[in-house]
């Protein structure tokens, strides 16, 4: 009998084209939507982390080769539908919508109903989304991360003791939301202005951290425990940004400089770095993965400090998986560099989760 797999997802609503001259700096998301999508400027990044039909269809097609798939949109009907269908396990790519614990909603509902699920548990999902709490745990566990504070008001930013330059971002958002060239603050006036803007825009605390001027990398991790492994490292090619632009992959790079007619080829995989640095990057990524007790898969963002030492920036236990190779979706890019097709990636992740849940190989059951 085929394994019954429930796919939990959030479907991105249709949105009008982005008007010419739009300048909202909060359009960016954890990774850019596909090139066909432009967000509604009335709610510029509210749904930025949700998936388009093409992504959901691609995941369904891949999972259908290893089981019977049930689509479970993670809306208000999700708990009742999950209780009714009761799949053998849930493959979770749902990001949630409201609150700092939104990425924990689906796994928490699964646990409440006793339905096994893939990827990290509610605690890990909540901690990873709260950048301040995640950095506290990383620091306590000795995982390298930049010095930081969490500011709840402009007054706290004004009293910050960290040396400039500093980098600021919302505490509870995906890695791109609220990140722009204005996030790099070189003096107290810029810092207070940007912190004020982010608090007013997102109604949440702001992480203020030492700016890391070195190379930036993304590491895709698969597996659990000692079997956790890194896929080829992705490097950020900041030399592809316009002349004079600061080395920041934020709103401007995702929405202004990267266009369908002139793609910004900023990702390089495998990254062109020395073997010793690559080993340090992988070690830092795995240390962070284990410190937050991630499961099955995760993406870890890393940037080097002024001395060239890798520092963990943040973790994403619900990484994006856009199927179009032209899109900047890191996990599929890393998988492709490892010789895996998109379907191979999704099947492998499902197999990793099913082995953890049942002790059996999902791939072997359909062989």
Where are the regions that the model predicts?
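Active-site nucleotide/adenylate-binding loops and adjacent lid/helix of ATP-dependent enzymes
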Residues: 1-8, 39, 83-86, 125-216, ...
